Amino acid sequence: MKTFSAKPHEVRHEWFVVDATDKVLGRLAAAIAHRLRGKHKPIYTPHVDTGDYIVVINADKLRVTGNKAEDKKYYRHSGYPGGIYETTFKKMHERFPTRPLEKAVKGMLPKGPLGYAMIKKLKIYAGDTHPHAAQQPQPLEINA
């Protein structure tokens, strides 16, 4: 018996739409990262992008548990001495509703060229509409 290895041109990438209304941030991000990597498919190969496209709608209705809305901090740096900025989940979610989910999923994907290709297959929208109707995405229920 030979070991199977998927070839990039043989992989079929499907489109799915996920409704993030009242879903917990980390659990939803873990399920999305799993799908983006393609680990749910029997043809999963670590060095080939076997994942699907995921369209997330209603990202503005995402939630976190406990006191994380005030306690969870996001950091960025300007590159200058003393140029560190911090913001809470609540502030970031109000200003950029899609960014907390994007950062959570990105942190769960591999770092390097393959991970960068995987994150490009994630489309996140704050409202309940998206411009990907032509791809006919299938609804995907994630119990998170």
UniProtKB/Swiss-Prot annotation:
It holds the Pfam family Ribosomal_L13. The keyword Ribonucleoprotein applies. InterPro entries: Ribosomal_uL13, Ribosomal_uL13_bac-type, Ribosomal_uL13_sf. One of its GO terms (molecular function) is mRNA binding. GO terms for cellular component: cytosolic large ribosomal subunit. Keywords: Ribonucleoprotein, Ribosomal protein. One of its GO terms (biological process) is negative regulation of translation. Belongs to the universal ribosomal protein uL13 family. Part of the 50S ribosomal subunit. This protein is one of the early assembly proteins of the 50S ribosomal subunit, although it is not seen to bind rRNA by itself. It is important during the early stages of 50S assembly. This is Large ribosomal subunit protein uL13. The lineage of its organism: Bacteria, Pseudomonadati, Pseudomonadota, Betaproteobacteria, Nitrosomonadales.
